[in-house]
Amino acid sequence: MTVTLTEKAEFRLRAFLRGSAKDANETTKGIRVSVKDGGCSGYEYLMDVTSQPQPDDLVTQQGSVLVYVDAKSAPLLEGIVIDFVEGLVESGFKFTNPNATSTCGCGKSFKVGDCSPEGVPCS
């Protein structure tokens, strides 16, 4: 499983994880990346902080950031590059997915061939 964090994304995630609330066991936290049906193109990216990955998650490490990938989402995320971009109007994580055949105008959702669910307009 190949998930790549750019230097900027790794820096931002490392700072975010360091500043997130500690759990009772002081467990090392990472990010869990997955996709769900949604958005105007069919699939939406999800990224959550977790210290308890799911048993079937695929685990990789980028710098000092643990990355857990949802096993069911893995085929849709193979080869993804996660970057952090800063702009005048909006800053945030940007996903470059080699499996996406198209993305919506806002860049928050994507389509993969003919297997994507029906999209709904972004709000």
Swiss-Prot record:
SUPFAM superfamilies: HesB-like domain. GO terms for molecular function: 2 iron, 2 sulfur cluster binding; 4 iron, 4 sulfur cluster binding; iron ion binding. InterPro entries: FeS_biogenesis (IPR000361), FeS_cluster_insertion (IPR016092), FeS_cluster_insertion_CS (IPR017870), HesB-like_dom_sf (IPR035903). Keywords: Nitrogen fixation. The keyword Glycosyltransferase does not apply. GO terms for biological process: iron-sulfur cluster assembly; nitrogen fixation. The keyword Membrane does not apply. It holds the Pfam family Fe-S_biosyn. Belongs to the HesB/IscA family. May be required for efficient nitrogen fixation. This is Protein HesB. The gene is hesB.
